[in-house]
Amino acid sequence: MTDLEQVAASHGFTAVKSEPISEVEGTVHLMHHAASGARLMFIENDDANKAFSITFKTPAADDTGVFHILEHSVLCGSEKFPVKEPFVNLLKTSMQTFLNAMTFPDKTMYPVASTNEQDLVNLMDVYLDAVFHPDIYRRPVIFQQEGWHRELEGEGEGERLVVNGVVYNEMKGALSEPDSVLYDGLSAALFPDTTYRFESGGTPAAIPTLTYEGFLENHRRHYRPDNAYIILYGNLDADRFLGFLDERYLAPLAAKERGPLDINPLGLQAPVAPAPVSVPMATAPENACAAVGFVIGRAAERERVVAADILMDAIMGANESPLKRVLLDAGIADDAIGYVADSVAQPFAVVSLRGARPGAADALRAIVEAEARRLAEGGLDRELVRAALSHAEFVMRERNFGYPDGVVLAMSAMAGWLYSDDDPAAYLRFEDVFASLREKVEEGYFEALLRELFLDNDHRACAEVVPTESDEAAEEAEAAGEREAAAELTEDEAASIREAVRALREAQEAPDAPEALEKLPQLSR
């Protein structure tokens, strides 16, 4: 038994595997916390910019955006740190190099990083208390503030019943972007039977159907140690961090009675090739857009997913790339882009048009098929493929995404680990993948992949966003509906709404208690 295995065992962790990985300039250790069921990956190297993240598998089961609202809400105070905005306080007092949280279509991630070990322990403490012991159970106003609530605005005949809330307003903005609406339409067409048919961020129509009880129930079911993926990164004291995790959170949580894990399903979609999907949207005619999508395979097929990304760059990465050139010359849109959507169970390739002309969706399908056939039969420009391969390798090696390496690598690891425990570190390795693909360039591999993706693929879809009316007309129709809803309220209902808003404003404006602020950890000067 190695020293690390002994340390792990002393804190309730079972060492599963240790593997040197040159791409992370260190060793990846996989562990399992027996009592709680938590998974843990320790990426051990000499990086002084240390990182911690905890991720939960949170597949959406509807369009209410419950996990997006939870991501916001758990960071509004917790049992141990009952302050309203710990984020704001930590940004002032911590040496953090990264402090954020993210909602994905099927997971919610809470990463932090710091160059100071004590600071990282402090940040970890705040985050773990937030996700496992949030104030949402004793302060319903958090749900109203971050999720949604109703308000009465205006006076007399102009009075309107409106919905407000941080996530609600955020998604109204996000889904006023045609590209976002197009992606959602394409994803729903490709995956009609799985979580990816839903907008995990929430839609303005569905968010107000989420109840406070449903909000809490989703937290109880998904924010559990046996649904958690913990990643430690950098040059840090394993004994200290594993001990902290075990003694402060995992062991106490394991001691509490709980039922079997019951999270929303995250299944695989059987191949589908539905009729083209048209999504009406109140937007200007020049915002019309269209896309075709082709499922590449499963996330575990690492080399195939990387190869598809290289292929898309080769044929769509620049204006002179073959498929993009043909699409632009056809005059069916102002611009064309291609990319691979990963960090999902079944990654897919997308060719998308912006500023699409009428009939562009049909033309897009025909042009993609014809050009793919020409390239598959006549051969790709091998120099173009090699250049795309070298660029992809450079991007992976440099990891220059504006985040600390520990955060980037945690996100990379979760792009594969979430879907399979067989090889959690698969998405951290890339040298062998690129070496293999470099050999295959001359063997016709990319031409074969082109044929498999675009010509012989029985899992594909097409979607378009069709402008229906001006933004102004849509806004006036919405306002008219809000005025009508306000007029239909009884006096008691209106009074109840006003009182709830008054209580919310009072809670928002009340300062944190000095004793609560003092509980937040700070580095000694």
Whereabouts are the PLM-identified features?
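Charge-rich, well-structured scaffold segments of protease-associated domains
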Residues: 1-11, 59, 73, 77-80, ...
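Short pre-active-site segment immediately N-terminal to the catalytic Zn-binding motif
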Residues: 55-65
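Short acidic-hydrophobic surface loop/beta-edge motif
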Residues: 27-34, 270-283
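N- or domain-start disorder-to-order transition segments that initiate the globular core
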Residues: 2-47, 519-525
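Active-site recognition of the HExxH zinc-binding catalytic motif
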Residues: 64-76
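Active-site-adjacent "gating/activation" loops or surface patches in catalytic cores
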Residues: 32-47, 283-291, 299-303, 342
